[in-house]
């Protein structure tokens, strides 16, 4: 149930109003970020949204220009960060990557680290909640924002229901959540063997509808993920890889879509979310046990509804909270400490015991090679799938032919036995025939001679009578 999660997030976003009407300036360099338009993507992030509540931000990508902070992540051209020597480098990731504090002064990530004031745990799901909160500032949305929240300040839109008719219906109790498809799956990265294996195992029990490029069953990729997910009782939301604390946006998408998440990725996910509100595959010894539990929920109405309507967050004294009390205040305090500290750790000669620049220069080359290998892998995978289909067809044909051969073999053996029996009978009859024929030949010869003699005597006896008849006929003139 997403509404309690939204309420808790909005509450975590509450901050005191600034005493001054003119926020201090903050120059931020974006070394590398997601997407082709890095500046634009950074402005869409929750980090920019939070910092803009306290600072007047100027963004740029010029290493020769002054920066209060420079942000970088392990994706894209990682070596760009090396060009920013005299600025405080902040690592931020949405992947299962740990920060290198020899290259970055500060870091924001998934790991549960304690590195004084240099690290903040802010999983990617917190950023996704920011986007969800923005999306429901809409008069037709089934989820409601508090009137005094930061997300309710802008003029609301009026198109949510038009784009999410099924989601609105199921959240507003206008349709039965039990009368939905079994499970959904949306993924674009095929290089996730655990996730793929679980999908195959679950799909063998009950069909799982795939709407992404991996294990797609629709014939096309869905464009509206949340509307798609809302049409199913469960959502298979495995992470690409496993890592303690590595909880991304996937579980948030399931909660938002009013479907039960089937989760795997962070073994410690129960610290972030209420274990009664989702299926945690890490809780089971193997896939079979997890699937048995999913089947139980699927077939037991009350158990399913209890989990569906659970608060996604853990509670303390009846109040929902984010793990480690994550909030806008905590994030702003983290950056306040950074800006007030003049130390640039990556430039400390005592930290550098080896040259770290040289290995980083090769990262881009390695990434190019990786992309090439990835393309080759995808091609090979397609060829493998085609060959597999052909093999399966040939196997089916072979099995059919084998069955036909076995049937013919049985029939042949039966016919052979019958033939052998008939042959024995034929030989016996032949012997009997020849024996009878040898005995009957003299009798036949005797019979023929006797018959001839009888006919001759009868003819001789009838001659006088025949002659008398002939004379009588002549007299009568006939």
From Swiss-Prot:
Key word Membrane present: yes
Region annotated Important for acceptor specificity, chain positions: 347-353
Any GO CC annotation of this UniProt entry: cytoplasm
A Pfam family per the record: FucT_N
GO molecular function, a single term: fucose binding
Name recorded for this polypeptide: Alpha-(1,3)-fucosyltransferase FucT
Outcome, altering residue 195 to K: Loss of 97% alpha-(1,3)-fucosyltransferase catalytic activity with a 6-fold decrease in affinity for GDP-fucose and a 14-fold increase in affinity for LacNAc
Annotated organism of origin: Helicobacter pylori (Campylobacter pylori)
Effect in UniProt of substituting residue 352 to A: 75 percent reduction in alpha-(1,3)-fucosyltransferase activity
Entry binding sites for substrate: 94, 186-189, 195, 222-225, 240, 246-250
Result after altering residue 352 to Y: No effect on alpha-(1,3)-fucosyltransferase activity
Membrane topology (UniProt): Peripheral membrane protein
Subcellular locations according to the entry: Membrane; Cytoplasm
Effect of residue 250 to A: Loss of alpha-(1,3)-fucosyltransferase catalytic activity
Organism ancestry: Bacteria, Pseudomonadati, Campylobacterota, Epsilonproteobacteria, Campylobacterales
Effect noted on mutating residue 350 to Y/A: No effect on alpha-(1,3)-fucosyltransferase activity
Disulfide cross-links: none
Subunit (UniProt): Homodimer.
GO BP, sorted A to Z: fucosylation; lipopolysaccharide biosynthetic process; protein glycosylation
SUPFAM superfamilies linked: UDP-Glycosyltransferase/glycogen phosphorylase (SSF53756)
Region (10 X 7 AA tandem repeat of D-D-L-R-[IV]-N-Y): 364-433
EC number assigned by the record: 2.4.1.152
Enzyme class: transferase
């Amino acid at each position: 149930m997403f509404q309690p999660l939204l309420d808790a997030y909005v509450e975590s976003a509450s901050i005191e109003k600034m005493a001054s009407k003119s926020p201090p300036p903050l120059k931020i360099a974006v070394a590398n970020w997601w997407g082709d338009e890095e500046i634009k993507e950074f402005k869409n992030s929750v980090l920019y949204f939070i910092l803009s509540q306290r600072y007047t931000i100027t963004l740029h990508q010029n290493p020769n220009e002054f920066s209060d902070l420079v942000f970088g992540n392990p994706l894209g051209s990682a070596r760009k960060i090396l060009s920013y020597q005299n600025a405080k480098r902040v690592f931020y990731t949405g992947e299962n990557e740990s920060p290198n504090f020899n290259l970055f002064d500060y870091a924001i990530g998934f790991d549960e680290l304690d590195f004084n004031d240099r690290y903040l745990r802010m999983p990617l799901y917190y950023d996704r909640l920011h986007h969800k909160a923005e999306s429901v500032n809409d008069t037709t949305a089934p989820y409601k924002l508090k009137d005094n929240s930061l997300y309710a300040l802008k003029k609301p839109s009026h198109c949510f229901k038009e784009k999410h008719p099924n989601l609105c219906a199921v959240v507003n109790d206008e349709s039965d959540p039990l009368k939905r498809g079994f499970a959904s799956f949306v993924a674009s990265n095929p290089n996730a063997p655990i996730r793929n294996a679980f999908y195959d195992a679950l799909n063998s029990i009950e069909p799982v509808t795939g709407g992404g490029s991996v294990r797609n069953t629709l014939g096309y990729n869905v464009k509206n993920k949340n509307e798609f997910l809302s049409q199913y009782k469960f959502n298979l939301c495995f992470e690409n890889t496993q890592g303690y604390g590595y909880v991304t946006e996937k579980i948030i998408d399931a909660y938002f879509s009013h479907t039960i998440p089937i989760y795997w990725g962070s073994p410690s996910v129960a610290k972030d979310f209420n274990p009664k509100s989702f299926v945690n595959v890490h809780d089971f010894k193997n896939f079979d046990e997890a699937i048995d539990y999913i089947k139980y929920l699927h077939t037991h109405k009350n158990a399913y509804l209890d989990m569906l309507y659970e608060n996604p967050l853990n509670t303390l004294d009846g109040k929902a909270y984010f793990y480690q009390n994550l909030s806008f205040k905590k994030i702003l305090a983290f950056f306040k400490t950074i800006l007030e500290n003049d130390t640039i750790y990556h430039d400390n000669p005592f930290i550098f015991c080896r040259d770290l620049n040289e290995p980083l220069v090769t990262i881009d080359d390695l990434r190019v090679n990786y992309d090439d290998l990835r393309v080759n892998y995808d091609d090979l995978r397609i060829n493998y799938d085609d060959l597999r289909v052909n093999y399966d067809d040939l196997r089916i044909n072979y099995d059919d032919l084998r069955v036909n051969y076995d049937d013919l073999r049985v029939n042949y053996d039966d016919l052979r036995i019958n033939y052998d029996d008939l042959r024995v009978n034929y030989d016996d009859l032949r012997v009997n025939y020849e024996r009878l024929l040898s005995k009957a030949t003299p009798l036949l010869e005797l019979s023929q001679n006797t018959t001839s003699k009888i006919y001759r005597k009868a003819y001789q006896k009838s001659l006088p009578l025949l002659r008398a008849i002939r004379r009588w006929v002549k007299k009568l003139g006939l």
